[in-house]
Amino acid sequence: MIDSEALESERVKLKRDIADLRANLNRKEQCLRELEAAIAAGEDSDEAEESSNDMPTPQTKLTNDDIARYSRQLILQDFGVQGQLKLKNSSVLIVGMGGLGCPAAQYLVAAGCGHLGLIDYDEVERSNLHRQILHSEHRCGMSKAESARIALLELNSHCQIRCHSRLINSMNAMHIIRPYDVVLDCSDNVATRYLLNDACVMLRKPLVSGSALKMDGQLTVYGYGQGPCYRCIYPVPPPPEAVTNCGDGGVLGAVTGIIGAMQALEAIKVIIGLGDVMSGRLLIFDGSSFMFRNIRIRTKRPNCHVCSAQPLITELIDYEMFCGMHATDKDNPLDLLEPDQRLEVKEYHQKLQSQPHLLLDVRPPAEFEICQLPRSINVPLSEILDDSYLKRFAKQLEDKELPIVLLCRRGNDSQIAVQHITNRFPAHSIRDLVGGLHAWTGSVDATFPIY
């Protein structure tokens, strides 16, 4: 007898594999085009990317095209010709071509920034497109930096754009940052924030920092004038378990657009000396109530380890070790449980699924609504940690023979939940599904949605 469900799962898996192959082909073809362009220009592509030589000779006048293109900002009293020339001769480095970096780059290029550097180690995915507005469906699988450059050059072909399709780290940060006038931190992860802060302090570069999560955003400028640096405000990194990224907490695309656009504005103000730069202050945006708050933050810390008169840190360190987390926005897989407390999705599917058991999905209700396994019961991790689940499952918990299986999106929160319940009921058989729903899609049912 033909198993139609298995055939459909295999069909979907093959289509997904073909899409991945096409994306990889697009990426390889783009790399080939870049290499051929570099060869045609008589330069080695790696040298073009890595070069720390000075930027081209400053321009002393605007062209007719400049005047026509930028006329609406040229007529601003505090901007004018000199402001446009400063912008034309400026160089800005954007770290992270995601939800913040895309709108920031778009507005800087549109305004006439002469030289732009783009850093991103990652590739475009469909889950990026709702907020990373420079990328497109047909460029999924391509380097984010390269994808952004294509879109930006369509907007303004006069801008010189240099791509760094790699992870910025302690080994390359000083070399990459040195040629630029201003740096935008659009990375939105803690380890990279400390890295960029320290490098910018050592190189005396202003750092325009933005962040966005859920419906909220923040913006400030570090290391500008007599203002504080990031370490002045946060001398010690937060514990890893207290940090939430947009992959877990979610974010509304328009919020990243607002913060990214304001980062571009602050960069322009720094470059041309316009207005009151957001240094020594923090802008907090609440998208749910659409309220902006502008609060004053502490001044420079006299004993700051980086920006004080006698700094303790004079060279870049291992920031992943310092922060206890990776310098990316990817989820770090936890390893909290013993092997006998973990259950592979294939084993669950083949053996346990048909037997009596209790399957608890510890994701938030909004995520449970997106998709769920049959017969799973939604018990958010927050309910487990505050023990409010005990009343709901008192009878099941009395039965020590009833297996309890916990799952989540990627297999991290379920481990935390297993630890907590096991401490309460050590005699019970309580296990988590390794890899969560992502593993279920990859190993059992390719038609199950991934988010």
Curated annotation (Swiss-Prot):
GO terms for cellular component: cytosol. Residues 353-449 form the Rhodanese domain. The keyword S-adenosyl-L-methionine does not apply. Binds 1 zinc ion per subunit. Keywords: ATP-binding, Cytoplasm, Metal-binding, Molybdenum cofactor biosynthesis, Multifunctional enzyme, Nucleotide-binding, Phosphoprotein, Transferase, tRNA processing, Zinc. One of its GO terms (biological process) is Mo-molybdopterin cofactor biosynthetic process. Zn(2+) binds at C229, C232, C304, C307. InterPro entries: MOCS3/Uba4, Rhodanese-like_dom, Rhodanese-like_dom_sf, ThiF/MoeB/HesA, ThiF_NAD_FAD-bd, Ubiquitin-activating_enz. It catalyses: [molybdopterin-synthase sulfur-carrier protein]-C-terminal Gly-Gly + ATP + H(+) = [molybdopterin-synthase sulfur-carrier protein]-C-terminal Gly-Gly-AMP + diphosphate; [molybdopterin-synthase sulfur-carrier protein]-C-terminal Gly-Gly-AMP + S-sulfanyl-L-cysteinyl-[cysteine desulfurase] + AH2 = [molybdopterin-synthase sulfur-carrier protein]-C-terminal-Gly-aminoethanethioate + L-cysteinyl-[cysteine desulfurase] + A + AMP + 2 H(+). It is found in: Cytoplasm. The keyword Aminoacyl-tRNA synthetase does not apply. Plays a central role in 2-thiolation of mcm(5)S(2)U at tRNA wobble positions of cytosolic tRNA(Lys), tRNA(Glu) and tRNA(Gln). Also essential during biosynthesis of the molybdenum cofactor. Acts by mediating the C-terminal thiocarboxylation of sulfur carriers URM1 and MOCS2A. Its N-terminus first activates URM1 and MOCS2A as acyl-adenylates (-COAMP), then the persulfide sulfur on the catalytic cysteine is transferred to URM1 and MOCS2A to form thiocarboxylation (-COSH) of their C-terminus. This is Adenylyltransferase and sulfurtransferase MOCS3-2.
